[in-house]
Amino acid sequence: MEDINLTIFSDDALPHAVVVDDYVIAIKRNPNGTFLEPHQMYDRYTQEFLQGKARDVLRQNGRDGYKLIIPEALSTGIIRYENKTKGAQSEVELENQLRSSIRHQRVKPRMDEAHRKLQIELRGGQILLHPRIAESIEFSIISKENATCSHTPVNCAYEVLLSGGINVGTGTCYDLSSRLKLRVIGDVDRHRRSMQNVLGRVIHTGDPKIINRVNQIGSQQFIDRAIGPDKFELKREIFDRLKALDVDVRKVIREEEASAELDEMGRRWMRDQNVNIVNDIIQSLVKKGSRSEKLAHRNEQGMQARFRRTIATNLRDQRQGKEVLNIRGTRGQPEEKKFAAVLLMTGCDIVERAIWSNEETAILRGLYAYAHDKLGCVYRAMKKDFVWSIRPTYTDRCAGVCDRKRTIMVREDYFDLQREENDSVYKWIITEWDKNDVIISAKNGYLYSKYSGEDEDDILVHEIDDRLYTAMIDRILINGWIEKEGLSQIIKEEVRLESFDFTKDAYVDEAGFLVLPEYYDRVIASNIYDCKFKISRVSITSSSNDDPWDKKTADSIIDEQCLWKIPLPNIIDVRPCFRGDLLTSNSQEYSKRFSGIIDELKKDKEIYDDFIPVQEGVRPCVQGHVCRYAFYRQKLTIFTILKRYYPIERILELTDEEDYEYNLYLDKECYKKESLILNLRSIFSLICFLIDFGYEGREITRGEDEYLKIFNEINYGGHARKEAINKYFPQFYQRLMRVRTSENIEDLLPLAFYQALLLSDPCTDNSEKSSHPLILFCQDKVRVVPIRTATQERGLPLLCCIHIFKFHPGLQMRKKELEDDIKKTLPAIFDYWIELEMKRLDTGDRLRTRAQMVELYYSTNCGGSYETLNFVFPIVHPNKGFIACVISSKGGMGALNEDDVRRRFRRIQSSIQGIFSISIDEEMEIQLHHSGNIQARILEKVFFEHKWHIVQVKLNGKIFENHELITKLMN
């Protein structure tokens, strides 16, 4: 076949046999040339679009019915074929390239069985493709540029989102559970006596007591989550512990789906204990416990299997003893409540401890949530209503304690908080140190020591517990590195910020007093995080829910430049600073924080000239200005922290002096490498450049394809990892191998760069509970500390570690001999890191498939967008290659479409023998663009009074054939 013909029609009266069946591609326009708006493409036969707040783009689950496609398979297959002909085939390398891509897509196609065509929708109509052509498709969202825009891949607008470079955060919130109601049974006189101490301060002593008791329920005031402004003052008094309380389960009009399913199963079980509902129970519990922002835990299937075995026994009364029988026979309790009690008891028994709302597996989270729905304060209700107590044999020391507490709080994500002004919540308030105050001498470095300030007598100090630290070192010497918990395991118990859980620590006791933890309303100062923390009752000052940068309480939002210092997911909520909706046809204002970033860019003289100038009165570009600059600053921060670990001779070579000062947080010295750092496309590439620059003497960057190859060989190369490091970084490798037997601090330092390499993939699978050993340089000694990166949250693991890397030795202590405990543990630590198996997210994970959705959002901040579908026609003669075709919707521009195709096939440019682009515009107009050694024209065809168009592409001697191209290339 020496030419290609495509049809374009809009007449429904045309028989498909005439305009579709005999053509490889047919385009059916919408009636009257109409176009759908972006929001109208939701849930159609096209690429996956999501609705909701833009800030949740990486938190939403994917929609059912969409299938994964891998557009890069064609490029990878051709490279594989070319390498095979050269005898340089590497199956593992090519597989890794596909698995590490972040450009996969999810599509919902429709198969027209009668006409053997795959039907896909664009805004302007339907594309009907032969299945052999459809295997090469890729969708693209093309953002239209305004006057100062630059929408090029070098902006890394999606990469900065994945790396957390435009995230903001703030302390999380807590409020009364929606399933509970608090009744006021009296006032609280908190202090029996008052006296003055020697400093003249008033000290309150004695236990609180209840006064003005109200015994009749009908006369008691109450609050629940649904209160209005008339009860805000009462809620404030309750949260301030001025009221005595009783707690009831709140009835709801309609249960959510999973709870309703479990209720029905419970009623069936009460009638027949042999009913086969085990699989249905598990399915509903997992549904109830699933959280869109959480990765599925590695042990999810194992936990479900354990639960399946035990619940099957319990439901059939085959359990030893009469606990299930007694629960089922309890009088005066609803059937659903009895069922929930049996499920809860089963869950606790299989893990041998009490379970809670923050469990790592979905089945246990769902189990607790269902029990909470039915029982309210679950362990108190189990003891009071079913005479079941937490077992003394459990491992959590909860027996006799937790079942006396009525826990009433739930965590509320700050960014999802929708409360009226003057309402109250509990909130973590976080205050960072003044960045201008931290001036460091290069000779002395920045070493960790516990906080000491003028206010240290009035606050709690977050610090390492020497006894717990010594116990951990002893375990390492015996077992190697097998630590699962993070830093909290070596921190003093009363200040363990890393493991505080206010939902467990705040409760109503048996007497009716609201009990808050010892750390409540106390400042906790931490030099590890360079911040002060306090949880207090706060008032809502704004109900705004559009811009994450808008404050809802009096305290501040933490910007992207400070967030890396505080990797505490248990007390901090984090979101991309995306304002507005994800899927909309309207232009949107970007976040106020982005305006601040642009102002900071204009003041940054070292790098501003590398950007398109910001024009007065013209809105700057989110991709070209905000994302690019935010990513640059994130990379610069990592560069300036890790450069302090360079060999001493390299530092002296770069600085020409040993005694100089720098600001720990405002240091921008990167030895005139600003432009190189700006253009690096990933954090991994940055770490590679740091090693090249510091150890190999390399002054320029490598190509991004080479960085990708290094990334896959080192991070996912298994046993070949050491050989890969030696191949690409030979000087660094020699120093790294000496870490295991380090004698002094200088010998230790290369380990930090190796750790950074392994932790620099934002698509790492963080689902398995574990911690990594990092080196913490302290004033009194060098310590090894456990840091958790596996938090079941998607994100860059390195951001959980940079706050430890910021502590670094000064130049004068580089030759200081290491203490014996570190020397003895180093072999175990080094072996752990060398053998560490990094696991990547699945090819279909949302981080790998949301690039186009994010591009669509970015376009609403600029000039809008249009969409394209591109695919290829294989050429077999005279030279193998392909012709690329692009079909675009209203506003499509041929030159931009061609650029997008060349972006897709950048690694196989020589295989492109021609490109033609068809833009379907309004009022039945068709735009045609072509390049390369082909010719294209639009023909008008009339057949039995029907009229339509044909796009004819002359191949100039080339022969279109080679069906099943990708299938053959990948086999």
From Swiss-Prot:
Record's keyword terms, sorted: Capsid protein, Inner capsid protein, Virion
Record-linked Pfam families: Orbi_VP2
Subcellular location: Virion
An example molecular function term from Gene Ontology annotations: structural molecule activity
Ligase keyword on record: no
Cited InterPro entries: Capsid_VP2_Orbivir
GO cellular component, one term: viral inner capsid
Role played: The VP2 protein is one of the two proteins (with VP5) which constitute the virus particle outer capsid. It is the major target of the host immunogenic response.
Protein name: Outer capsid protein VP2
Chain's gene name: Segment-2
